[in-house]
């Protein structure tokens, strides 16, 4: 039998790219066949041009391979007595006691995992110089937007999520970057200082050091609750389970220093604050609904149930609303809905319950969580592909909501506010003058920036960063250059090696990456003709996009594995997604909320009816809704 297996494997090897031979040798026979399928499709016909059902099949095969070979544990897993989940039927303040086999998994200060093996870059942290890369390849020359696909609410949403998921623990040691002479005159800062990422020993032989996440990586809405008991105490009223919010304005409250009172306010701006305020109102509305159902519920009970419900609503909106607009294709519409509802769909699941299989019934509601043998975490690579600051414009366009809406519910422009005036304390002051409704409507009608080369906001190249408590630091930073440095410092592979690790064929020339002649010329100059030196962020921005995708295909494959993992590894989305844990009313609340529009309508009943023409609150509001397609979704063929 071994001889036959060896013979088959050697034959298959001839069809596999040489860069995958090493990983291929470690695969099971089944996985070798699956890699051959993925590899064959990649070479012959792009998966996104296949009929929807075949495209979904390809993505399921690819996701399986990533789950087997792209989940790398960092840090030792403590061995101890297994706890009883029944003792913790709620989300804890610091993320502990979710995984029954390891109480610390997903808690504040746990390690970032990895999707790709780390590549030590200490010898070339400054090659090419990050400020040269930022100036020649990233800095905005002319604003490029996303058309009608993605608006400023969508741009705010992803930062809202990042504040829920990830933030690296910093060291006390400062690094300084100085602009080389060749670009110094074009750099907003001639030099800047910042704290390096803290390297922490893991106790592992292979991955010796790692980084710690000072946010809880679970989808637990720590963006409004905080990642520890101290912050949670700051945001709670301790009355009827509710969180602090201005009843008069619907905006966040502020402390004596002018800092917003919410779960995470570091490096925030008015768009994120607006979403925090909206979901605090959602939490409080859940408390009221639960209290109406059962007047005997105490403050702590109401808070715990409402947090579960609100977190699930946020996760659902991200899965079947935000991501669908980000990856605007029929295949991903089907795929993201299948992640939540399964291939059998919402009607079947609502009528008959979970079908048992995650493919047929969805990840949500599975009988038990699934971590594929690797303790849950978010990853260094996940952090890298979520570098999306190019979504931000230079000004926010404030519209006149007192005027009569025009064609497609459009509104006249009355003011342009610099994004600098919408950050931190100043942003909170500016927002108080604008008001929630005007801000949300204005963001809804404004297109976000596109994730492209030479579209990184210049105002972010001279910005005041915050410490973890939201206080301004003394040193300005060049965020574009800093992001290049961070990926290198954290041993995230550069673009080509990243692709190899994700079973993607590496590029051999700049023309494989982009057709833009100017970009090719600058890439060749900055990287001295060596495609292997290309930084990941630059490659993700330069890469030709799939039609309908706002992000690169390379970034998407990290989404493919990690979007599912955030749901399937969490018992509150799987074994504990039920009436016992959520209450009957709470589960009904989650199951009947399908979009951000539903949440807006609940708290601002006239807003979308009056000013939103689009199908989703994440696409530009004056865009027409999609026309109904009579062809069943799974049978559609991409145009």
Curated annotation (Swiss-Prot):
It is found in: Lipid droplet. Changing residue 318 to Q: Reduces oxygenase activity 4-fold. Disruption phenotype: Slightly higher accumulation of Pseudomonas syringae pv. tomato DC3000 in infected leaves. Partially impaired systemic acquired resistance (SAR) in response to incompatible interaction. When associated with LOX1 disruption; hypersensitivity to the growth-inhibitory effect of abscisic acid (ABA) accompanied by an accumulation of ABA-inducible marker genes. Induction: Induced by salicylic acid (SA) and by some chemicals generating reactive oxygen species (ROS, e.g. nitric oxide (NO), intracellular superoxide and singlet oxygen) such as sodium nitropruside (SNP), paraquat and rose bengal (RB). Accumulates locally, at the infection site, in response to both incompatible and compatible bacterial pathogens (e.g. Pseudomonas syringae pv. tomato DC3000) in a SA-dependent manner, with a faster response during hypersensitive reactions. Binds 1 heme b (iron(II)-protoporphyrin IX) group per subunit. Binds 1 calcium ion per subunit. The active site is at 163 (proton acceptor). The record marks 266 as: Transition state stabilizer. Its cofactor is heme b; Ca(2+). Its EC number is 1.13.11.92. Expressed in roots (epiderm), mature flowers (e.g. anthers) and senescing leaves. Forms monomers in solution. Belongs to the peroxidase family. Alpha-dioxygenase that catalyzes the primary oxygenation step of a variety of 14-20 carbon fatty acids, containing up to three unsaturated bonds, into their corresponding 2R-hydroperoxides. Involved in the production of oxylipins that function in cell signaling, wound healing, and protection from infection. Mediates protection against oxidative stress and cell death, probably by generating some lipid-derived molecules. This is Alpha-dioxygenase 1. It comes from Arabidopsis thaliana.
């Amino acid at each position: 039998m071994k001889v036959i297996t060896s013979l088959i494997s050697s034959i298959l090897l001839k069809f596999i790219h040489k860069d995958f031979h090493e990983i291929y040798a470690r695969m099971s026979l089944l996985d070798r066949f699956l890699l051959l399928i993925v590899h064959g499709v990649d070479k012959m016909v792009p998966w996104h041009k296949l009929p929807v059902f075949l495209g979904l099949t390809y993505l399921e095969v690819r996701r399986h391979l990533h789950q087997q070979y792209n989940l790398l544990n960092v840090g030792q897993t403590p061995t101890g007595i297994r706890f009883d989940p029944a003792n913790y039927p709620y989300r804890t303040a610091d993320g502990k006691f979710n995984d029954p086999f390891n109480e610390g998994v997903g808690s504040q200060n746990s390690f970032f995992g990895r999707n790709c093996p780390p590549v030590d870059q200490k010898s070339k942290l400054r090659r090419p110089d990050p400020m040269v890369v930022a100036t020649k390849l990233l800095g905005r020359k002319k604003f490029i937007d996303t058309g009608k696909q993605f608006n400023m609410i969508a741009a705010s949403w992803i930062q809202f999520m990042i504040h829920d998921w990830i933030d690296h623990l910093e060291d006390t040691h400062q690094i300084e970057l100085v602009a080389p002479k060749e670009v110094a005159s074009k750099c907003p800062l001639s030099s800047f200082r910042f704290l390096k990422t803290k390297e922490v020993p893991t106790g592992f032989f292979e991955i010796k050091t790692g980084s710690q996440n000072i946010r809880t990586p679970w989808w637990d809405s720590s963006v409004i609750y905080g990642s520890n008991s101290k912050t949670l105490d700051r945001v709670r009223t301790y009355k009827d389970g509710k969180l602090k919010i201005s009843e008069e304005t619907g905006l966040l409250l502020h402390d004596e220093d002018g800092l917003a009172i919410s779960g995470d306010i570091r490096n925030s701006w008015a768009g994120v604050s607006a979403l925090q305020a909206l979901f605090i109102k959602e939490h409080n509305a859940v408390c009221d609904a639960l209290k109406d159902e059962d007047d005997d519920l105490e403050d702590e009970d109401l808070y715990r149930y409402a947090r579960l419900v609100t977190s699930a609503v946020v996760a659902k909106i991200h899965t079947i609303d935000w991501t669908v607009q980000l990856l605007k294709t029929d295949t991903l519409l089907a795929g993201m809905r299948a992640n939540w509802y399964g291939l059998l769909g919402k009607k079947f699941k609502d009528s008959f319950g979970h079908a048992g299989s995650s493919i047929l019934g969805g990840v949500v509601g599975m009988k038990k969580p699934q971590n594929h043998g690797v303790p849950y975490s978010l990853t260094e690579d996940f952090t890298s592909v979520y570098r999306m600051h190019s979504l931000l414009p230079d000004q926010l366009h404030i519209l006149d909501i007192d005027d009569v809406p025009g064609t497609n519910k459009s509104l006249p422009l009355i003011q342009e506010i610099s994004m600098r005036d919408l950050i931190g304390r100043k942003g909170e002051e500016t927002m108080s003058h604008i008001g929630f409704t005007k801000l949300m409507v204005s963001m809804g009608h404004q297109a976000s920036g596109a994730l492209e080369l030479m579209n990184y906001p210049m105002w972010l190249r001279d910005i005041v960063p915050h410490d973890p408590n939201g206080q301004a630091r003394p040193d300005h930073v060049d965020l574009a250059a800093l992001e290049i440095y961070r990926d290198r410092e954290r041993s995230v592979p550069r673009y080509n090696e990243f692709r190899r690790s994700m079973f993607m064929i590496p590029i051999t020339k700049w023309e494989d990456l982009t057709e833009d002649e100017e970009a090719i010329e600058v890439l060749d100059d900055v990287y001295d003709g060596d495609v292997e030196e290309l930084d990941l962020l630059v490659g993700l921005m330069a890469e030709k996009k799939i039609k309908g995708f706002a992000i690169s295909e390379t970034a998407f494959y990290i989404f493919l594995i990690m979007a599912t993992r955030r749901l399937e590894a969490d018992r509150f989305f799987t074994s504990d997604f039920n009436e016992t844990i959520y209450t009957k009313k709470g589960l009904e609340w989650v199951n009947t909320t399908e979009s951000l529009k539903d949440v807006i309508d609940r708290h601002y009943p006239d807003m979308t009816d009056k000013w939103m023409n689009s199908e989703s609150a994440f696409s530009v509001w004056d865009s027409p809704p999609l026309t109904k397609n009579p062809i069943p979704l799974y049978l559609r063929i991409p145009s």
